[in-house]
Design a protein with these regions (language model features):
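Cell-envelope and extracellular/periplasmic
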Residues: 1-246
Length: 246
């Protein structure tokens, strides 16, 4: 990210601005970056650097140009799950910055341990095309389910989301493995995930003790992306360390 941040290195940023101006401008910017910053040191600076790049781009191009961002896929040999909080930083950036959108990148095929395959990139391009069309040209909305609330309910945990008409499962996988719940006693195993129209209901191995925090797909190997919105077939946007309300 440092090479895209004018306050740090910024060489790639300056090259981008030069090429956009030479081409006469663009209607939007597609942003797919983050794997190189999936470590504790770089991730800590990512939110500030990305926000500064968006601000600088709009200033230098003289318009409130929209950004369409994508979370990283997965890193099959990366053991440090904590570093992949970068996905949560990207999710929150789309919530807090004007005209910044985000798509998940769950379950797409890889060509190696980290990079999308050609087939994966084609699928990602199709998703982006639909989102850009829906946003810029007045087409059908194409936003992925995004966590809105995590609430204790009769000993279970109910999840509600933005941008969902109803959930469905594409295939019978072990969805519980994509979630991680921690509380004052440490890890609390998710035993099952049930679809309840627009919500998901999680059952846990024990009651939540003290403060609880839930993550989904924030680990390097996931998520599978088997639970999708029926209308768009988009999977849930990965989130990390969202507090459980009581």
């Amino acid at each position: 990210m440092a090479r895209w941040d004018n306050a740090r290195n910024g060489d790639l940023y300056r090259n981008m601005i030069e090429k956009i101006k030479a081409a006469g401008g663009v209607r939007a910017i597609l942003w797919y970056q983050g794997c190189a910053d999936a470590d504790a040191k770089n991730a800590a600076q990512y939110a500030e650097s990305f926000a500064r790049m968006v601000k600088d781009t709009r200033r230098d191009l003289g318009e409130e140009i929209p950004f369409f961002t994508m979370q990283p896929n997965r890193y099959e040999t990366q053991p440090d799950a904590a570093s992949w909080g970068i996905k949560e930083i990207q999710r929150r950036s789309a919530l807090t910055l004007e005209k910044v959108h985000i798509l998940p990148n769950a379950g797409l095929p890889l060509s190696d341990e980290i990079h999308n395959s050609s087939a994966g990139n084609v699928t990602l391009g199709q998703m982006l095309a639909r989102q850009v069309h829906g946003t810029l040209n007045g087409g059908l909305p194409f936003e992925a389910p995004d966590i809105k609330n995590v609430q204790l309910e009769n000993g279970n945990i109910r999840l509600s989301f933005r941008h969902v008409s109803a959930f469905t499962r594409l295939r019978p996988l072990h969805d519980a493995a994509d979630f991680c719940l921690t509380d004052d006693l440490g890890k609390n195993e998710i035993q099952s995930v049930s679809v309840q129209e627009k919500d998901l209901l999680l059952t846990t191995a024990r009651s939540v003790q003290g403060k609880g925090y839930l993550s989904y797909g924030a680990h390097p190997q996931g998520p599978e992306g088997a639970i999708v919105n029926q209308q768009t077939y988009l999977p849930i946007i990965s989130f990390d360390h969202v507090e459980v309300s009581k």
